[in-house]
Amino acid sequence: MINLRKTHPLMKIINHSFIDLPAPSNISAWWNFGSLLGVCLVIQILTGLFLAMHYTSDTLTAFSSVAHICRDVNYGWLIRNLHANGASMFFMCLFLHVGRGIYYGSYLYKETWNIGVILLLTVMATAFVGYVLPWGQMSFWGATVITNLLSAIPYIGTTLAEWIWGGFAVDKATLTRFFAFHFILPFIIMALVMVHLLFLHETGSNNPSGINPDSDKIPFHPYYTIKDALGLMILLLVLLSLALFSPDSLGDPDNFSPANPLNTPPHIKPEWYFLFAYAILRSIPNKLGGVLALLASILILLIIPLLHTANQRSMMFRPVSQTLFWILTANLITLTWIGGQPVEQPFIIIGQLASILYFTLILVLMPLAGMFENYMLEPKR
């Protein structure tokens, strides 16, 4: 009998992507996050679909429709908690996935890396518009503050902000269009994921050593399907623990109050996964400058391949670059902490120093470290 998975036009694509795919024999658990992100996306789309069946995108009923989902819909509380905490798991996996790419030099597959950065931006946009939908206090004021940043763009800013709002402030039109965006974007993300995988399979996976693994490849199934299954179990354990035991621990208490344009919360802040960028935005006392720094903090990932100066691809055998990488990690954690603090001393100066260090590490210190390591590894007479 002819093996169907090797002959059927559709099964053949799946076979070459997930079953008979030649994979390096030495890839570590840091390579699990790609498949985990795929699982997160599927969980978010499925839970989101069921939430959309009961949600109403109207300023008068949005908040109560979310309450209705949690109180009256069968397992609605679970679906909502999985969706809200699934977003946190999604971003945790995303940050670890990007960090792995930087540490092991995966960014030198430029097409895959660039699509990945576009994916990151798209997921961030999706999460932002999704956070507005429950129409609580922090949803409303978060939407107001972030969309207001568009007005910092010279000449067209105010017109652009009002165009996004569909009026002169965040209101019914804004909520309706944000729901439309939040529904369509995950499907765009799915398409981009396919392009991401297409480019990845053109070159094959990188590996911890950073050297060409062509001489030693193994089939993806069963070796890495089993390895990914372990990661999946851990992901589901953490997600279910969060959703069942502590579903509101990552949310903001202000979002339990319905949106009120007449009452501003004392501290407006986004979800934890945006706090690092929010801290960079706040560290510059100029509106346009802050917006540019905010954009630069994410878009800087696009130029990382151009800043690679080392002769070795991976940081595995580069202790100076490793040290700088972990300083960058600690710096991002510091920025995340600062983003959640009120705008007062000493948090202002800590945020400004951490923001300067963030850009200095990526643009100056890491390329210099690569050049220094090249020099140290040159044979001396």
Swiss-Prot record:
Binding positions (a ubiquinone): H201
Source superkingdom: Eukaryota
Other remarks on this protein: Heme 1 (or BL or b562) is low-potential and absorbs at about 562 nm, and heme 2 (or BH or b566) is high-potential and absorbs at about 566 nm.
Protein name: Cytochrome b
GO biological process: mitochondrial electron transport, ubiquinol to cytochrome c
SUPFAM superfamilies (UniProt xref): a domain/subunit of cytochrome bc1 complex (Ubiquinol-cytochrome c reductase) (SSF81648), Transmembrane di-heme cytochromes (SSF81342)
Amino acids binding heme b b566: H97, H196
Organism: Sminthopsis archeri (Chestnut dunnart)
InterPro entries assigned to the protein according to its UniProt record, in alphabetical order: Cyt_b/b6_C, Cyt_b/b6_C_sf, Cyt_b/b6_N, Cytb/b6-like_sf, Cytochrome_b, Cytochrome_b_C_euk/bac, Cytochrome_b_N_euk/bac, Di-haem_cyt_TM
Keywords: Electron transport, Heme, Iron, Membrane, Metal-binding, Mitochondrion, Mitochondrion inner membrane, Respiratory chain, Transmembrane, Transmembrane helix, Transport, Ubiquinone
GO function terms (MF aspect): metal ion binding; ubiquinol-cytochrome-c reductase activity
Summary of subunit composition and partner proteins: The cytochrome bc1 complex contains 11 subunits: 3 respiratory subunits (MT-CYB, CYC1 and UQCRFS1), 2 core proteins (UQCRC1 and UQCRC2) and 6 low-molecular weight proteins (UQCRH/QCR6, UQCRB/QCR7, UQCRQ/QCR8, UQCR10/QCR9, UQCR11/QCR10 and a cleavage product of UQCRFS1). This cytochrome bc1 complex then forms a dimer.
